[in-house]
Amino acid sequence: MNRGIWTCLVSLAMLASLAATALAETAGGPHREYPRDRARERSWRSGFEGRTYLRVHGGISLPSGDFSNAVNTGLGLGASLGYGIGRNTILSGGVAYHRFGEDFADGHVSVVPVTAAVDYGFSSGGRVRPWISGGLGLYHLSETVVVSPTVEATDRENDVGFNLGFGIALPTSGRNAWGVGFKYHHISGDTFPDTNFLTLQAGLSYPL
């Protein structure tokens, strides 16, 4: 089993562990509840409709398939602006940046997705809110290789791609929330055929 698959399995286990811990805390029995906590819970459960959210996120990016044979695990960060079109549904547009080091050359591959997405948050009786997401958009891919101390060679391409994901979210203060999520990205291109990678990220959501 290659490194990418192992990393993927470990990442999924981490996400499952976080979800289980949060669920256990939610169902852990009676606890003292303050007025501020009750107000936060009411706001959290009232839904997304008519609200605008700014979300920022960052974490690890895991190459998959043939892509994992050429590059190493990288890092990613991004931001999105979303609007609640329903009680449980958010329509958003976002941009992100992912950078992967190369195995066999002194260089790196970067991926910049500019995507639109639909997120659906499942209602729950506790503080934990599971969600699923699907997105589509333009992915800018770039490979830079250092040929000599003064020369770099770069290939660039813009391709259409999609992403699918899931995760959990928890309220912090007011309508703010933090969460963790796992996403799969697939990009089809010519210079970069069938580029696949996974992301495990943590993020914060702020109402505007």
Sequence positions of predicted segments:
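Hydrophobic membrane-targeting alpha-helices
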Residues: A16-A22, G121
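Transmembrane beta-strand segments that form the barrel wall of outer-membrane beta-barrel proteins
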Residues: L54-D66, L91-G101, L136-L138, W178-S188
